[in-house]
Each structure stands twice: as structure tokens, then as C-alpha cells.
Amino acid sequence: MHAASRESMTELATTLDNTVAQSNAAVDGAQIGPELFDVVEVLDSNRDLRVALIDPAASSEKRADLADRVFGEKLNQASRSVLRSAVDKDWSNTRDFRNGLVQLGRRALFRAAEADDKLTTVESELFQLARVLEDAPQLEMLLADRQASADRRRQLLASVLYGKVTSITETLALQAISRAKQRPVEACETLSREAAQLRGYEVAHVVTAGELSDTQRSTLADKLGRIYGHKMSIHGEVDPSILGGMVIRVGDERIDGSTSGKLEKLRRAFA
């Protein structure tokens, strides 16, 4: 996002948090998120409306009135308030405005999960969904197929997720693959990371040959926290092919301490 849009998003995140905090966060957050996603669906198919809602030549009152005329009857009071606040802000371009509404929708759902004491569950489910898709390349290819309609791709993923994850995880994942700029695997990882960051954590993706115990996870999180200067959320993945040790990825940094990695280094050294 450009500078003006980033400033608007910072202010809107606070506005959203206050809106949710003043009500039943678990209920209102769970409504605001999907309703903002519905607004985005309309905007995606109507460029003129996107332009009109952020037109700097129009007064903020005129833009808010337009938002009310188009969306008012489809949104609850809290969602209308957030949308009116969004069109009142300055945006560098329509893409930032559209993406900003998506971010606000996600934040509302994360706040709903937090209020229901399920944010860590949602974070974990999104990470595990990324692993499922990574292990099922044919499914990921179908979910990323731009020739298929967004509805068809959402229906496919919904059939996979039915009864297996929380409703908030499902809503987030379905929106992410409907018009994704990333691979579905990356989109789910991004969502999981955003959930962790809302809790004040950074993510360490840790691959081991066997499942880590709770004690091992806690010890590793403490060590990585001291190294990176942040509280760390351990996203664990089991891959027996690494034989032993672990591979750790934090952001763009990758640390290969696996047995297979060490053997490969020896092989190259003697090649």
C-alpha cells in the first residue's frame, strides 16, 4: 500500500477494534467480516463504483451516502459504520481501497475468534490447511484455476472443509481463494501469520522428522524469541524424510539443521 492508504488502514484498524469492542465482539465481528467480503465482491465487478467511493473530488458525506444507497440494506449497523469510515478516508488508488476492506474483514473475523477464545485455533487450522493443500497439488491447482468461477472454487473448498474447521477459518479460507493473488497454500499461510501477529507473535515454520512435544515447542519458542526479539508461534510440520534435526523458517530466513541437510552437504563436499 502507498503512504496515504497505509495511514488510512492504521486508523481504520483502530476504528474496527473500537466498534467490535463496544458490542458483542464474537457476534459482530463474525458478521462484519463476511459482509465486508460481500462488499468487495460487488466492488470487484464494478470499477465505476470503486472509483466513485474514493473520489477525492466528492465530499466524504457524498461518498458515504453512495455507500449507504448501494450497500445499506445489505449490511448490519456495525458493518455500515465501518464501511462509512472507510470511504471517509484517503486512498491512493482503488486497489488499496479494495484490499483495505479485505484486511478489515479479516481483522473483524480474527477479533471474533479472539473474543471466543479461538484465535490460536484459527491460526493453527489455517496453517494445517496450507499443509493439506501443499500435499494435494491437484486440489490446489483446481482452487487456483482462474477459468473456474469463484463460486465453483469456493464450493470445492467448502466441501473439503465441511465439519473439519471452525466457521471463521472456513470463511477466511473461502474468501482468500475466491480472488487470490497468491497460491492457495501461500494465501492460507498469510492468513495464519496475520492471526499470529494479531496476538503479538511472529511465526516460525518448523519441520521435524517426528512430532514435537509441548515441552520441546515451548523451549524452541523461547530460544527463537531470544534470537529474533519477538514472541514466537511455532507452526510445526512433520516430514520423516529429513531423518532428524529440524528445518526452521522465519520470514525469508531458512535454517537447515536437518540430518538430511547435513548429509547432503557432506555429499557435495566429497563430490
Swiss-Prot record:
Annotated GO MF terms: proton-transporting ATP synthase activity, rotational mechanism
Protein origin, superkingdom: Bacteria
Keyword Ion transport part of the UniProt annotation: yes
Gene3D superfamilies for the chain: N-terminal domain of the delta subunit of the F1F0-ATP synthase (1.10.520.20)
Protein localization: Cell membrane
Subunit architecture: F-type ATPases have 2 components, F(1) - the catalytic core - and F(0) - the membrane proton channel. F(1) has five subunits: alpha(3), beta(3), gamma(1), delta(1), epsilon(1). F(0) has three main subunits: a(1), b(2) and c(10-14). The alpha and beta chains form an alternating ring which encloses part of the gamma chain. F(1) is attached to F(0) by a central stalk formed by the gamma and epsilon chains, while a peripheral stalk is formed by the delta and b chains.
Entry function: F(1)F(0) ATP synthase produces ATP from ADP in the presence of a proton or sodium gradient. F-type ATPases consist of two structural domains, F(1) containing the extramembraneous catalytic core and F(0) containing the membrane proton channel, linked together by a central stalk and a peripheral stalk. During catalysis, ATP synthesis in the catalytic domain of F(1) is coupled via a rotary mechanism of the central stalk subunits to proton translocation. This protein is part of the stalk that links CF(0) to CF(1). It either transmits conformational changes from CF(0) to CF(1) or is implicated in proton conduction.
PANTHER family: ATP SYNTHASE DELTA CHAIN
Protein name according to UniProt: ATP synthase subunit delta
